């Protein structure tokens, strides 16, 4: 449900672009009434006749038969446009309609020989002072490519030129087609021009929209190497291609004119979660190239006559409010909830000094002046689709981060996803969730929650996966606390619903809302800073705002891309995943036995029961993932020099040990409650043996991930009291092999788990040549190198694996003589042979 974290689509100089002069000797094109050769220039009225269909807009679009023509005014030559290409309709397996494929700034310019060029403008480098000599050096090193060339077909009174764009939009041009990586991913070959066409063009005052159908040949993906590990990025062949040899997609290209006067930038701060844009700046006095990164946000400004009021602390209405229109295709009963989700953000903007800053409106009946494709209007689009999704993108000016417009995509079937989520996380407490179909009030509440989250993205806010960590777990059961603060300070977290609340707590509202952090983030992003001259001056003021909240966890931003900070997680609640997951599992144990009764219906089969059982298992797996992230965890707290303390700190050793103890207790001890025969016998031929093993194996493999083990080695090297890699090996081994000490019979589930554990240790003796590195997000710079992962052969990993296999071999040998259960004995004998062969290969 999200958009891009950081867009670096390129950068040119910050100064205003000028129309490129024609090369010396070139002759500017002129209107000519003489007859021309086919394909050459014609008199305007000979080309544009009374039979031509014409739409006026930023480009006047003409249609002659099957040909589409752009009439481009001289006044927009050299102006910058953003081309955004999105999927409109897709074949199965190729993503969702509305997903972005390409985004590029371009400008039209006249070239020699009666040509018009479409030049890509790359925002990579800039010079802050356009009066200094260094500007020319930047220009000389950043020549923008000519992406396309068009013959001028006619000139209108020396004020505009006409070009034929039919072949360009029908073809496979990178700016308005699939991204090359997507074509490789889906094994697509050449475009099939006889099956590709322009479906429609529409032009508006600041944008032109082109809908295209493109067909590609489908190719077989390259063969994978034998025994190669699964690669989710490996090329695949789409079902449509496998069945027919071809793949057809529908795409929409938007050409949106960027503001003539760029907005003022607000420099990015890693401690507040905004999307960002940036480029490298070369300054005359600077001794190195600087990366300038700025927040993505709307241009929200007070009217000049209201500035004095705002300085006095009075709320004022913005010069131009943010307005979202509700798609007329939206079912009537859901419109009020979508509108409420938009306007839930009004209180956040009030904290920034604005009233009525964000509004939701319906398109008046019969009003043809407001179109969903007109970039002057932002919409919540409603799609009658079985896709379970919603998304909140924006189109913004890469020069400044100013958001131009947004179209939130809302798929009808997201309601199915919401039903599943809320049932699994809330039905133990909320009786309204204990049925196949929710009533309108409950579904409306769910729609409002998701709408508010997506609107947050369109305002520039990223996911704050660290927000829910601000709430102590026991406060999630405190009705008075929840009524005041909610269960998370940010609706931008994936905290979903309060799954910790127990039936006896009397909690009635399990939903998140626009919270303390959200209001603060909007204040940081949108409150005007008066009486400063530059973004750098403004940054110093903003820094003081951040410092004033730096020690309050309610205001903390935890990035959504950090792979090792357990405070920043998706789908979790509370400040302790072990305790929160214990409560969550209690509720899953209440829900599972009741699913059959909640979903029974006359003449219906058990498909819905099967679906919801899998949802229960999926929620349980999430809890295991939340806890696992504590092991080898590293806290990352972005700071500036004014703040005390370290940026990077290992997760406390006690919490890591608690995490492994939790896994031993809730997962590695067979979760019998998941194996309810009254449910399983209705939906599966087996008894859940393989399903349990899969969850256990996935978690065990994650625990012994090379990057995680390397972090444990690193933290112990700095602090001997840290939770060590040897502690992990010991705690897992003693938990999984507890029967060696208790002398109890080992059941099927535990035998499988013990084999998985032994095989994992054996695999560690022969690591791959290059262990995968974990992702690393450095909040102060972009493009940082991955966190280091040592060559396992040159670290303690193999040594510890060998040592613990020796210990395990000794323990099994000691237990075998007193093992009376036949299958337990066979199992131990088998594992003993495997270990011996691994340790003493012949």
Task: Give the location of each predicted region.
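Sec/Tat signal peptide C-region and signal peptidase I cleavage site
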Residues: 8-12
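Sec-exported extracytoplasmic/periplasmic mature domains
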Residues: 343-354, 456-457, 461, 497, ...
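Zn2+-dependent metallopeptidase catalytic core
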Residues: 77, 331-357
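Conserved catalytic/binding loops enriched for acidic/polar residues
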Residues: 468-842
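Bacterial N-terminal signal peptides
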Residues: 1-7
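Solvent-exposed, polar/charged alpha-helical surfaces in well-ordered, non-transmembrane soluble domains
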Residues: 42, 336-343, 347, 449, ...
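Auxiliary tRNA-acceptor-end handling modules of aminoacyl-tRNA synthetases
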Residues: 14-68, 72-330, 348, 363-418, ...
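The catalytic-center signature of Zn2+-dependent metalloproteases
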Residues: 39, 362-383, 445-452, 456-502
């Amino acid at each position: 449900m999200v958009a891009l974290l950081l867009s670096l689509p390129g950068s040119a100089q910050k100064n205003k672009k000028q129309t490129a002069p024609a090369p010396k000797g070139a002759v500017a094109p002129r209107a000519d009434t003489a007859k021309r050769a086919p394909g050459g220039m014609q008199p305007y009225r000979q080309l544009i006749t009374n039979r031509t269909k014409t739409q006026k807009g930023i480009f006047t679009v003409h249609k002659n038969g099957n040909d589409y023509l752009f009439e481009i005014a001289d006044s927009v030559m050299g102006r910058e446009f953003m081309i955004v290409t999105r999927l409109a309709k897709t074949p199965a397996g190729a993503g969702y309609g509305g997903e972005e494929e390409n985004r590029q700034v371009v400008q039209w310019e006249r070239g020699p020989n009666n040509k018009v060029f479409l030049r890509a403008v790359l925002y990579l480098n800039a010079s802050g002072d356009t009066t200094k000599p260094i500007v020319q050096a930047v220009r000389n090193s950043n020549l923008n490519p000519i992406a396309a060339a068009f013959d001028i077909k006619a000139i209108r009174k020396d004020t505009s030129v006409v070009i034929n764009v039919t072949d360009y939009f029908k073809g496979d041009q990178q700016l308005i087609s699939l991204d090359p990586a997507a074509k490789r991913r889906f094994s697509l070959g050449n475009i099939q021009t006889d099956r590709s066409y322009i479906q429609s063009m529409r032009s508006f005052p600041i944008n032109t929209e082109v809908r295209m159908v493109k067909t590609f040949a489908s190719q077989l993906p390259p063969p994978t190497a034998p025994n190669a590990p699964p690669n989710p990025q490996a090329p695949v062949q789409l079902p449509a291609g496998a069945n027919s040899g071809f793949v057809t997609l529908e795409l929409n290209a938007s050409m949106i004119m960027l503001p003539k006067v760029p907005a003022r930038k607000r420099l990015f701060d890693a401690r507040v979660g905004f999307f960002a844009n940036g480029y490298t700046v070369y300054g005359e006095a600077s001794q190195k190239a600087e990366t300038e990164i700025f927040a993505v946000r709307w241009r929200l400004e007070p009217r000049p006559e209201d500035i004095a009021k705002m300085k006095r602390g009075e709320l004022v209405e913005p010069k131009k409010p943010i307005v979202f229109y509700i798609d007329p295709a939206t079912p009537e009963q859901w419109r009020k909830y979508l509108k409420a989700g938009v306007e839930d953000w009004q209180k956040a903007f009030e904290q920034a000094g604005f009233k009525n800053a964000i509004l939701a409106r319906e398109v008046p009946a019969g009003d043809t002046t407001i179109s969903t494709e007109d970039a002057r209007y932002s919409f919540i689009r409603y799609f009658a689709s079985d896709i379970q999704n919603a998304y909140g993108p924006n189109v913004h000016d890469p020069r400044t981060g100013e958001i131009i417009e947004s179209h939130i995509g809302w798929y009808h079937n997201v309601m199915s996803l919401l039903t599943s989520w809320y049932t699994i996380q809330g039905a133990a407490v909320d009786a309204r969730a204990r049925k196949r179909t929710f009533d309108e009030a409950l579904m409306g509440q769910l729609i409002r929650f998701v709408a508010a989250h997506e609107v947050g993205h369109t305002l520039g806010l990223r996911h704050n996966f660290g927000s829910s960590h601000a709430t102590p777990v026991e406060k999630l059961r405190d009705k008075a606390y929840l009524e005041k603060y909610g269960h998370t300070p940010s609706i931008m977290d994936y905290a979903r619903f309060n799954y910790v609340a127990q039936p006896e707590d009397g909690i009635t509202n399990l939903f998140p809302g626009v919270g303390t952090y959200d209001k603060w983030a909007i204040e940081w992003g949108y409150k005007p800073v008066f009486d400063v001259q530059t973004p750098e001056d403004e940054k110093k003021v903003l820094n003081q705002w951040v410092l004033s909240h730096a020690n309050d966890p309610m205001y903390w931003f935890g990035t959504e891309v950090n792979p090792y900070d357990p405070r920043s997680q998706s789908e979790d609640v509370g400040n302790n995943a072990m305790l929160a997951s214990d409560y969550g599992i209690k509720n899953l144990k209440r829900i599972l036995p009741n699913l059959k009764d909640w979903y029974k219906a006359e003449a219906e089969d058990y498909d819905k029961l099967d679906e919801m059982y899998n949802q229960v298992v999926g929620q349980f797996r999430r809890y295991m993932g939340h806890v696992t992230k504590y092991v080898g965890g590293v806290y990352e707290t972005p700071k500036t020099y004014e703040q005390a303390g370290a940026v990077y700190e290992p997760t406390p050793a006690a919490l890591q040990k608690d995490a492994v103890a939790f896994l031993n207790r809730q997962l590695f001890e067979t979760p019998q409650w998941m194996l309810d025969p009254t449910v399983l016998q209705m939906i599966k031929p087996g008894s859940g043996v393989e399903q349990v093993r899969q969850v256990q194996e996935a978690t065990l493999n994650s625990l012994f991930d090379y990057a995680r083990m390397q972090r444990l080695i690193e933290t112990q090297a700095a602090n001997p009291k840290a939770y060590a890699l040897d502690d992990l090996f010991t705690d897992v081994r003693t938990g999984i092999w507890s029967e060696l000490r208790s002398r109890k019979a080992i059941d099927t589930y535990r035998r499988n788990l013990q084999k998985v554990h032994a095989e994992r240790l054996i695999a560690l003796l022969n690591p791959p040549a290059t262990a995968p590195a974990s992702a690393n997000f450095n909040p102060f710079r972009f493009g940082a190198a991955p966190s280091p992962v040592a060559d396992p052969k040159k670290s303690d990993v193999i040594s510890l694996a060998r040592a613990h296999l020796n210990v395990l071999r000794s323990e099994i040998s000691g237990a075998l003589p007193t093992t009376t259960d036949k299958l337990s004995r066979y199992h131990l004998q088998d594992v003993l042979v495997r270990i011996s062969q691994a340790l003493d290969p012949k």
